[in-house]
Amino acid sequence: MIDKEKIKKAVREILEAIGEDPDREGLLETPDRVARMYEEIFSGLHTDVKDVIKIFQEDEHQEIILVKDIPLYSMCEHHLLPFIGVAHVAYLPRKGRILGLSKVARIVDVLSKRPQLQERLTSEIADTIMEAVNPLGVAVVIEAEHLCMTMRGVKKPGSKTVTSALRGIFRTDQKARAEVMALINSKR
């Protein structure tokens, strides 16, 4: 579990370290607010992703299933600044085993709510779906803006990082890969 008291103490010390007065009017409740925020945005650390997965048997469906533009936010583990974007998650069912559509979004949500790297998050989503339903293939593409590149360092607001993870047939078969990427990149 998250130790909110430790977080409050640490935030107070950070405020002091940057030359602020943690006892001034506008900052009095900041340590508590940050502790509650961290409990929420890092809730994926204490959630087993398997608990959000529900599998259905749908023998008739044997084509690509794609959930596009799933909003996501996570905290870059290098600077503890957010990265915000969307995930596109596609898979090709095997023997009719499918995930509920909302479960795809929940997988993204749980795995995002941890200190993360976008590259690892992309792979974790793909691997979770591979393990859960053993599809013929999985493709995950994440597009995100990293505030560590927007607010500091290179200071390039609006730049996006795109990562992909391909598993199964989407990695080994060029035609299948082209089809799934065309679906992901379509504007409709």
Swiss-Prot record:
Keyword annotations: GTP-binding, Hydrolase, Metal-binding, Nucleotide-binding, One-carbon metabolism, Zinc
Pfam families, sorted: GTP_cyclohydroI
GO CC, alphabetical: cytoplasm
Residue ranges of coiled coil: none
EC number(s) stated in the UniProt entry for this protein: 3.5.4.16
PROSITE patterns, A to Z: GTP_CYCLOHYDROL_1_1, GTP_CYCLOHYDROL_1_2
Catalytic activity: GTP + H2O = 7,8-dihydroneopterin 3'-triphosphate + formate + H(+)
Molecular function in Gene Ontology: GTP binding; GTP cyclohydrolase I activity; zinc ion binding
Keyword Zinc part of the UniProt annotation: yes
GO biological process annotation, one example: one-carbon metabolic process
Chain residues that bind Zn(2+): 76, 79, 148
Pathway(s) of this molecule: Cofactor biosynthesis; 7,8-dihydroneopterin triphosphate biosynthesis; 7,8-dihydroneopterin triphosphate from GTP: step 1/1
Family per similarity comment: Belongs to the GTP cyclohydrolase I family.
Subunit structure: Toroid-shaped homodecamer, composed of two pentamers of five dimers.
Protein name: GTP cyclohydrolase 1
Organism: Caldanaerobacter subterraneus subsp. tengcongensis (strain DSM 15242 / JCM 11007 / NBRC 100824 / MB4) (Thermoanaerobacter tengcongensis)
